[in-house]
């Protein structure tokens, strides 16, 4: 056996090329790709390995053959017996290369003269790899034989067809020249020159010239098996009768459109656009040659769809006319998937020409028109000659029309060749192959490729002496083309000339194809998609030429140098540009984002404002909890209200403890956290201060709780801090329960309290609202049980849940620095469980939990959700109200703390920058007369530090600004005193004492050190200190009025005004204003006051006196004198 290409063997066996290549390589063969030839020994080795996969579907194919045979065997009985023989004896074709060069030569004579099975056998043998009727595909082919008789030439998994392509939807036969002997059920032979014998049940022969016999049921012909009426495989339709659009040989569409050649209702009656031989359209219109949307056309030319062979209802095409709306033809295939002799995935291509645009023909046709021979741009044509009008005759073609063998180099396939996987006579992978496969799809039935198919990779090149040579294998075969015999010398010459013209046309088109980036190359070069092909990199010029839009991210304020660096330009260029625009700047000048954006646009750069990501928020962000892991937790209740309204006393009554007696001044100055058990249910209470100084504490309390109890005294009613507490609770989205306290007092008025709270949208339930009001008395413990029941009921309605099996997370209620224990933080666990030994981070502080104590001071090992505990082990005092998190390890805690610290530094730096701006500096210079009171605040707990700082800062006014230069937790120490001495500050200690060393230094350095236990006192003293710093203010005080009665002149004294005191009294050293007839003529000091000749200190009303004014002597009688003094006004 001769050599064979791997891909041909792969098609035969129905396996992937690479599988065989890999198999051979594993056996030590030197094959490199599926295009390599392999020896007979290797072929047998591969067949032995993969033969099982080929024969696996045989029964199915046989069944198909039989099934299609049983339908209606009553017509065309002349050849029934012979047709029945063929499928009943399936020929399993072992694939072998082209043998018996003379077999095909005499095939047509045998076909014409005899209808014997010998002819059938002849076709089968010729069909070895090149001319087989059936393409073997795993999808259940409807070939004549069983499925094992694979077509050695065409093997495409996608069912790209060739003459011998079989597809699940009705494949055709693989032989080009069908022996149209008797076939059951419309199987067509693949021979071009059909023996148009009778066929039962409308089977079509494969002959080009239609035998217009009747066909019932329109079953498809030779190679076409489609469920809905497939076509036969011969170009000339056997235009038998077909109902319901079953197609024939060439048309392969599931909807049964189109038949081989002529589709007319008269051709054999076909209702509703059933096609025939050549037309492949989804609607079934179309014809052999030209397909127009209206489907006119003819064997020659037919206007308006009138048929020649038979009439066509509107829209069925004819043999000759084909239009470019994607209708396929024998030759015309479009990307819309129209089928062809060999149907292909893109549907383009034809028997001969396959182009990406879907043109194609038996020979060559531009723009998708196709006919048997030459196809013209208009797509019209007839069986033989297709002209724009579609006239033509069967044989004669003037004007260079193509013939059976005219093929173009532009990747058009011949009988077989197709680029991109279209099938061929003996189909080749990726479209190679003509008669025996041509690379790049050139190939023809017997194309006159003497001058044009010179590509060394061409397949069997058909020349004028009708010999073909395979340059790869060296085999030669001289198979005479029956159709070529029919052509006269003149016709060949005309076709040859026409090919020359078309070649030029196609060259241009091919050039366009390359420019458009199409896969197919202009000269029919090798398929660029083949394995191992060199892929030319695409030019990147267009990308390079595009101006890339740059984007820079800039902050709110930046210097010109920073902007220039971000834009990657020289700073001096930016300065120069601004200078030319009239702006005097330097590279260190600061500009706003808007100005920077304008500058950047001048350089075609888009500026985007920098969005500061809050690292802290990102770190504190947490995922949603799984509902299945949630368990019920105790409610956290916050007691809020105005100072002295009885919040702590109410808690005492609930806890049956006495807390108030321990609070300085009887008012609460810390947040107290307690756990109370009521009827087996735990409730966590937070007691917040009611004094106005503790606003932030109340806010923290509201944020960390589920229910807020608003305590309002029945005798006092709604007070300022009550309103503030309502605001905090609403802002935190907390359910409010109003406890009206002190109802045991005689002056208690519950209804007035309800009315006042209505103004703040708290309406009692008995007034039609939804707020729970509970009258209680902390003193007599009246209403306490009812209040607790309401708390538990509200908590149940809220369905309070938390996941205890996770890392702990919560809020810091209070923090302090204990002399013996170090930093102590009171925290409320909100999620998870906190254990002793856990690493935690609170803002910028972190540490390991060394010990935990509950609200009663007992050591505990763990704290579950809604449990308040005190923890030890932090490296610094955290700020109250911050969130704490337990972490996996200390390193993670340290990283989070560092993020907090760095963010705090950035914020401080930004504040400092803002303060040091020129505008700020100028305003400070202007306000140089403002005095500052520097304070250092030390307190026992962090919450108190905040409260004192906020209260004192509020005291600032236009003349004296209170400045807290340091605030901290713990006792007053040496460093605090030194800082106060340096900055001339007053130290305020709240519930703390100075140590001995600090006290000595304070006395030595004369540092004012004030200690307080009640916040009221601290505020009052600071107010007094501020007043002492204020500049004194004076106002005018009128002493009395006098009238000048007589004027005296005295040497050495000047003019003396003898005056009478009208009211008040005149005192020495006062000032005077003199008015004459309503006009003030003098204002100045009184130089001398005498009564008669004696100097006196004062003169009362009704007495006379002498007045001398400084540097004023122009006094006249009856002038009015007003005397006043400037008196200091206390502040």
Curated annotation (Swiss-Prot):
Signal sequence region: none
One cellular component term from this protein's GO annotations in UniProt: cytosol
Residues that hold GTP according to the record: 641-648, 687-691, 741-744
Pfam families according to UniProt: EF-G_D2, GTP_EFTU, IF-2, IF2_N
Gene Ontology MF terms in the entry: GTP binding; GTPase activity; translation initiation factor activity
Region (G2): 666-670
Annotated spans, G1: 641-648
Segments of this protein annotated with the region G3: 687-690
Compositionally biased intervals (Gly residues): 411-436
InterPro entries in the record: EF-G-like_DII, IF2_II, IF2_N, P-loop_NTPase, Small_GTP-bd, T_Tr_GTP-bd_dom, TF_IF2_bacterial-like, TIF_IF2
HAMAP family from the UniProt entry: IF_2_B (MF_00100_B)
Name the UniProt record assigns to this protein: Translation initiation factor IF-2
Organism: Lachnoclostridium phytofermentans (strain ATCC 700394 / DSM 18823 / ISDg)
Record gene name: infB
